[in-house]
Amino acid sequence: MFSKVRLLLNKELQRQRENICLIASENYVSQDILAVTGSVLTNKYAEGYPSKRFYQGCEVVDESENLAIESCKTLFGAQWANVQPHSGSSANYAVYLALLKPGDTILGLDLNCGGHLTHGSPVNFSGKQYQAVTYSLDFETETLDYDAILQIALEHKPKLIICGFSNYSRTVDFKKFSAIAKQVNAYLLADIAHIAGFIAAGLHQNPLPFVDVVTSTTHKTLRGPRGGIIMSNNQAIIKKLDSGVFPGCQGGPLQHVIAAKYVCFKEALNPKFKQYMQQVKDNALAMANWFLKQGYRVVSKGTETHLFSLVVGNGKDVALWLQKANIVLNMNTIPFETKSAFSPSGIRLGTPAMTTRGFKTNDFIFVASLIDKVIKSNGNQKVISQTKTAVLNLLKRFPLYKGLAY
């Protein structure tokens, strides 16, 4: 049975090695994180929190979880942190359970404009259990309009406002969001899943001084294992937040992942991480600017983060063409989208993964030129084949997980 899994593991390893990954929410963890995630800690059940478990034999995982908590607090300047959420969605759900009652009003960014499913989408728990109201981007600039957000907040009086997004390429002014939340007496949640790496590196405003609670994933720009975290400096709500995670929406935490989160936080505390995040930002800007110069429509006319969206007409077709050429990204809706989410107008491009492999600005500009050729060829098979060859030749200079095999 394991031979079948081993075959798939090696197949996936080869796929990752031979593809250019431009999916903004993906990255490559270190081999240390791979090792810890696959460690014996996966065997330990540990409901509860350090020193307050419902199982015996938790003395070791108490230590590892405390290490993760303290390093997370140090990395972000937080007074309190919970490292148990299985994902960013779980973290958001726990916050809602802690601070809201079913039917309460929440205010988040519209999904088509870059919001997340858990920010009030009608197909998600956040839109089913709560009264979800959305704000949009400015139609002309495709950026946040804080005055318009204030007017919506004043009209609907939400109990919770969510800032932080899954597809927004500009910086977020958490101080302005804080002023809005205070005017309507709402809790303020910053979902920093995509920009956590920039905040940790000091390259983006830290939300903690301005918001009630922060949620994040650990596997995007933080370059850690798949998981979630919650942080807060609001002492009045931290017990509620702990209860929102356990027993609110989770049972036993994933101790092997929590230990890997600790490794992730320690890696991000290394001064080299700031250099990495600056390169991520430089690479995204160089790529976006190249597309702009070629006459493409880039949403919000650029980027200040690790990602941007390109308007290509039929995002699904373009994503499939590029996949055949070993360039992997995702189709995505654009602001004020008129087409289906299953066949949207745009594609989303991100730079964290390939920056981890060593790509610099010139490499991303070269990749942009390859994407341009495939798009302009309308998916011509000869062009796709030529592009795939160019990709494989390029990746020879950027090996991934040397010596690793299953």
Swiss-Prot record:
Tell me where in or outside the cell this protein is found. Answer: Cytoplasm
Q: Which cofactor does it need?
A: pyridoxal 5'-phosphate
User: Which CDD domains does this entry report, sorted A to Z?
Assistant: SHMT
Q: Where are the transmembrane segments?
A: none
EC number from the UniProt entry: 2.1.2.1
Q: Which UniProt keywords apply?
A: Amino-acid biosynthesis, Cytoplasm, One-carbon metabolism, Pyridoxal phosphate, Transferase
Q: Which residues bind (6S)-5,6,7,8-tetrahydrofolate?
A: 111, 115-117, 340-342
Report the principal subcellular site. cytoplasm
N6-(pyridoxal phosphate)lysine PTM sites in chain numbering: 220
Q: Which reaction does it catalyse?
A: (6R)-5,10-methylene-5,6,7,8-tetrahydrofolate + glycine + H2O = (6S)-5,6,7,8-tetrahydrofolate + L-serine
Provide a GO biological process annotation.
tetrahydrofolate interconversion
Q: Note the subunit structure.
A: Homodimer.
Protein task = Catalyzes the reversible interconversion of serine and glycine with tetrahydrofolate (THF) serving as the one-carbon carrier. This reaction serves as the major source of one-carbon groups required for the biosynthesis of purines, thymidylate, methionine, and other important biomolecules. Also exhibits THF-independent aldolase activity toward beta-hydroxyamino acids, producing glycine and aldehydes, via a retro-aldol mechanism.
Stated name of the protein = Serine hydroxymethyltransferase
